């Protein structure tokens, strides 16, 4: 949960600055694009069960790969296409990734431990929200003002999230 939310929280924390800094998309559109990403996240959550049915064991890498694609589009394609497609990928990754992590944690912990697992997931979520900007600030202090540094940082976190997700054992077939 920490890696997922770290990858996600870098988007709303830096999207307006990054996008307006490019000068292609006007500031009047930024809030609408971010709201659209939230709407896409809703659909990601609603479609999670269907995605899980189609991807089966591949579900564990779905969200990390979408974060990677989303931040790659934001960083290297840019413009309207990269911004809209990247935002949609990041929103969908967040929307589908959270129910995956919750269901996986509940499955592994068992029914009796669910009351302790959910607070721990919430703690990881809030810790990521707190630490992501602080880690980015520390990175900026080390390397200086690099264009799209927040997106590069998010790409690194998404790679870590992908590697961590690959460690999740496949579910037994029913």
Model-derived features with residue positions:
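Helical-face signature of the major facilitator-like transporter fold
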Residues: 1, 5, 79-91
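A membrane-interface helix-boundary motif in multi-pass transporters
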Residues: 136-157
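Intracellular juxtamembrane helix-capping segments at the cytosolic ends
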Residues: 96-109
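Helix-to-loop junctions at the C-terminal end of transmembrane segments
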Residues: 43-56, 140
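A late C-terminal transmembrane helix in Major Facilitator Superfamily
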Residues: 108-143
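Structural signature of the two symmetry-related core transmembrane helices
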Residues: 58-73
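Extracytoplasmic gate region of multi-pass secondary transporters
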Residues: 1-34
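Multi-pass alpha-helical transporter architecture, strongest
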Residues: 152-174
């Amino acid at each position: 949960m920490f890696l997922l939310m770290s990858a996600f929280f870098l988007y709303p924390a830096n999207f307006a600055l990054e996008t307006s800094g490019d000068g292609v998309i006007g500031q009047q559109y930024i809030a609408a694009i971010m709201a659209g990403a939230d709407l896409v996240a809703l659909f990601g959550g609603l479609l999670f069960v269907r995605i899980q049915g189609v991807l089966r064991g591949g579900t564990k890498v779905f969200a990390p790969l979408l974060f990677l694609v989303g931040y790659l589009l934001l960083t290297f394609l840019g413009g309207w296409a990269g911004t809209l497609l990247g935002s949609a990928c990041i929103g969908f990754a967040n929307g589908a990734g959270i129910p995956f992590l919750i269901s996986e944690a509940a499955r592994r912990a068992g029914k009796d431990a669910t009351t302790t697992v959910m607070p721990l997931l919430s703690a990881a979520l809030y810790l990521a929200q707190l630490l992501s900007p602080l880690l980015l600030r520390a990175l900026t202090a080390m390397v200086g003002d690099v264009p799209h540094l927040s997106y590069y940082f998010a790409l690194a976190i998404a790679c870590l999230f992908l590697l961590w997700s690959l460690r999740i054992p496949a579910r037994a077939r029913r």
